[in-house]
Amino acid sequence: MCMKLSLIAAVAANGVIGAGGDIPWQYPEDLTHFKETTVGHPVIMGRRTFESIRRDLDGPLPERLNIVLTTTPHQLPDSVTAVTSTTAAVAEAADSDASTTYVIGGATVYEQFLPQADELILTELAAAFDGDTVFPTVDWSNWTEMERTTHSEFAIVRYTRTSSDSA
């Protein structure tokens, strides 16, 4: 079975995904969507994203294999799987036999996985927000919108890859 790699993110109208290690907005419907989508699947994140989650939840994301990409794996708790490369992250996820693995941030990790992603699930916010972290630039000619669910202040949009980023 081939594992699908999906990037999932909430992105402001100006591309912002974070500010000072936090998400600069609160939309409960989006958090519910994130949880319902990722529970039971491996999630890959960078160390700073993990630290933000650990601060908010007092631990890793529950009911998910938390794979943390870091240069200092010895500094992470045993409750997560620490890896030092994207290849190792994908291998750990594949070992879980999950059909889909979700990349959940931050910006550098999204950028590293974008070329190999099969799917993007983006919460596209109508408003712009101040922040210091942005989603990487996407070549939209490689992606097709497959599904859109519109809410009052955002839309959840699923895109699938139609061609490779590497030419």
Swiss-Prot record:
Known EC number:
1.5.1.3
Pfam families, per the entry: DHFR_1
How would you classify this enzyme at the top EC level?
A: oxidoreductase
Q: Which residues form the DHFR domain?
A: 4-167
Q: Which Gene3D superfamilies match?
A: Dihydrofolate Reductase, subunit A
Cellular component aspect of the GO annotation: cytosol
Please give the CDD domains that the UniProt record associates with this protein. DHFR
Q: Organism's domain of life? A: Archaea
In the record, what terms sit under GO molecular function?
dihydrofolate reductase activity; NADP binding
Q: Which protein family is it in?
A: Belongs to the dihydrofolate reductase family.
What PANTHER family does this protein's entry cite? DIHYDROFOLATE REDUCTASE (PTHR48069:SF3)
The name of this protein is Dihydrofolate reductase 2
- According to its UniProt entry, this protein's organism is Haloarcula marismortui (strain ATCC 43049 / DSM 3752 / JCM 8966 / VKM B-1809) (Halobacterium marismortui)
